[in-house]
Amino acid sequence: MKSDPTGPPDILIEPGAMYPPLSGVGYYARELLKAYSVLPGRFPMKILSYRFFLKSRTSAAEKYLETLAGEIGATVEIRRRTAPSGVHHRLRGSALRSPFPLDLAGPGGHRIYFFPNYVGAPLLRSTCVPVIYDLGFLRYPDALRARDHLYLRRYLPRTLRRASRIVVISETIKRELQEAFSIPDEKIAVIYPAVDHTAFRPDIPPEARAAVRAKYSLPGPYLFSLSTLEPRKNFPRLVEAYALLPADVRNRYPLAVAGGEGWKNEALFAAIRRLGLEDRVKFLGYIPGADRAPLMREADLFVLPSLYEGFGMPVLEAMACGTPVVTTERGAIPEVGGEAVVYADPLDPQSIAREMAAVLGDPALRRRLSAAGPLRAAAFRWEASARRLAGVFESAARDIP
C-alpha cells in the first residue's frame, strides 16, 4: 500500500528484534515505540510482516505482530516473500546472504523505514533510520558468535552509509561510531533507554515481591545479576569474586543469576565447578518482564561486572528499584550510574569482591545508594526519549525524495 505523498510519511518498522522472548534490543524498541505512539502529531506506523506468497493462513507470528501493533498504535503491513519461512530464516542466519526479502530493495515512496536492530535492508534506497546499541563486534569480536560478527561486519557499514539518521543509545556509542565510521555529528541522535517507573520503583507491593521469591525459590537474602550469559557480561569473574567473599557472607547470600542462555558461556560453568559453588550460584533462566522489577527490588545487591555496555539497562532498573549496585566503568555505564552506584575493576575479581563486601557490610553506604538510585533513574523517561525519536523522524522526513 502506497503512502499519500501529500500527508505525513508512514514509519515502516522491521520487527525482527521484537519477537518474544525479548532481549534488551527488543525491549528498547517496543517501549520506545509505545511512548512514541501517544505523542500528538506522530507519524503513522506500520509493522512489516512477511508471508510466503503461496500461503494464505495467518501464522502465529502474524498473530503476535497484530498484538504488538495494538500495543504500539500501529497497523500490520503484509509483504509477500518468495521463499517459505524456514528457508527465509536460514538465509537470515547466514552472514553470507542478505537478511531481508528482496521487496525491501529499491525506492520505497513516502515512508521511512525504521530498523531497530542495527542493520537495514542492504538494497533499500528509501529513507531509513537504524538503531545502533554498541560496537562490540569491533571492540570485542571474540565475544560474539562468528556468524553475528560476520553479519555485522558485512551489513552494518552499508546501513550506516545509506541511513538518513542514526539512533544510538548513549553518548559513548555516538563517539565510538564517529571514530570508527567518520559519521557527521548531525546525522546521529542519542536516545537513551528508560524504565517504566510505575513498575520499577522502591515501593513494589509486598505480594508481588513474595510471589517472585516463591516462584524462583529465593526465601532469604540474595545477590542478583541479570543479563544474557555471554562473554562481555564477565560472569566468570563475578563467580570468582563471589568465591572470594568470606564464607559467612556466601552462606547468607546465594548468587542468583538471571538471563537467557546466550553463547560462549563454558568458562562460567567451568568456574562454578572449579570453585565448588554449585550449591551457591542459582540460575533462574530467562525472566519474564513482569518478574524483573520485584526480583530487582528484593535483592540485597545487584552486580553487573560487564566488560563493555552500550548503555546498561539492568543497572538502571536496579537503581530505579532502590537496590544498591556494584558495576564497572566500562562503556556507557557511567552515563547511567553516575555517582549513584559503586564501581569495580572488571578485570580484577578481588576488586569486584572488595566492592561487593563493602556495600554489604556498610549500612550507611547501602542507605545512600538506595536513596540515590531512584533519584538518578528518574532522569531516564520513555516520554523524553519518544520526543527525541519524533525529532529524528521529522528530520528524516525532510530527506524523502
Give residue spans per PLM region.
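Carbohydrate transferase catalytic cores enriched for Leloir-type hexosyltransferases
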Residues: 1-401
